[in-house]
């Protein structure tokens, strides 16, 4: 416990909260170019081939981005919009592609939560 004198000399420091999506630089989304599109296996106890892509953002930073929904049309040099939002069973994946925007088509045949997947009615 510090004395009053110590607090007068050097006051208490506020803890700064660290951003969960630092490369977006406080923007809601950022545009980027796909460098490679591949799959990744999730942590235990899950088992699948999750679709991911490596993206170079407009600020020059590279991130691993998850492609949500069933099926996609992304390939190398596709332009995508990237938003924050981690995927719990993929370590190191903290961003997601916005479906239905730029080169990423929406999920066709989607009936529920369509706005998340860029699906038309």
From Swiss-Prot:
InterPro entries assigned: NA-bd_OB-fold, Ribosomal_uS12, Ribosomal_uS12_bac
Ordered alphabetically, the record's keywords are: Methylation, Ribonucleoprotein, Ribosomal protein, RNA-binding, rRNA-binding, tRNA-binding
One GO term in the molecular function aspect is: tRNA binding
Cite a GO CC annotation. Answer: ribosome
The record's annotation in Gene3D superfamilies points to:
Nucleic acid-binding proteins (2.40.50.140)
What segment(s) does the record annotate as region Disordered?
Answer: 1-25
Question: Which GO BP terms sit in this record?
Answer: translation
Tell me the residues on which 3-methylthioaspartic acid occurs: 89
Q: Compositional bias of type Basic residues: which residue ranges? A: 9-18
User: What is the superkingdom listed in this entry's lineage?
Assistant: Bacteria
Purpose of the protein: With S4 and S5 plays an important role in translational accuracy. Interacts with and stabilizes bases of the 16S rRNA that are involved in tRNA selection in the A site and with the mRNA backbone. Located at the interface of the 30S and 50S subunits, it traverses the body of the 30S subunit contacting proteins on the other side and probably holding the rRNA structure together. The combined cluster of proteins S8, S12 and S17 appears to hold together the shoulder and platform of the 30S subunit.
| Quaternary data | Part of the 30S ribosomal subunit. Contacts proteins S8 and S17. May interact with IF1 in the 30S initiation complex.
Task: Please give the PANTHER family that the UniProt record associates with this protein.
Answer: 30S RIBOSOMAL PROTEIN S12 FAMILY MEMBER
- Please state which protein family the record places this protein in: Belongs to the universal ribosomal protein uS12 family.
The identity of this protein, by name, is Small ribosomal subunit protein uS12
Organism per entry: Rhodopirellula baltica (strain DSM 10527 / NCIMB 13988 / SH1)
The taxonomy runs: Bacteria, Pseudomonadati, Planctomycetota, Planctomycetia, Pirellulales
Q: Which gene encodes it?
A: rpsL
């Amino acid at each position: 416990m510090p004395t009053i004198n110590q607090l007068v000399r050097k006051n208490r420091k506020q803890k700064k909260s660290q951003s969960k999506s630092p490369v977006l630089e406080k923007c809601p989304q950022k545009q980027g170019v796909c460098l490679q599109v591949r799959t990744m296996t999730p942590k235990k106890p899950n088992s699948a081939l999750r679709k991911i892509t490596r993206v170079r953002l407009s600020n020059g930073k590279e991130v691993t981005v998850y492609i949500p929904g069933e099926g996609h049309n992304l390939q190398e040099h596709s332009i995508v919009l990237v938003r924050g939002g981690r995927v719990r069973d993929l370590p190191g994946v903290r961003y997601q592609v916005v479906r239905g925007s730029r080169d990423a088509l929406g999920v066709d045949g989607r009936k529920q939560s369509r706005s998340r997947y860029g699906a038309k009615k």
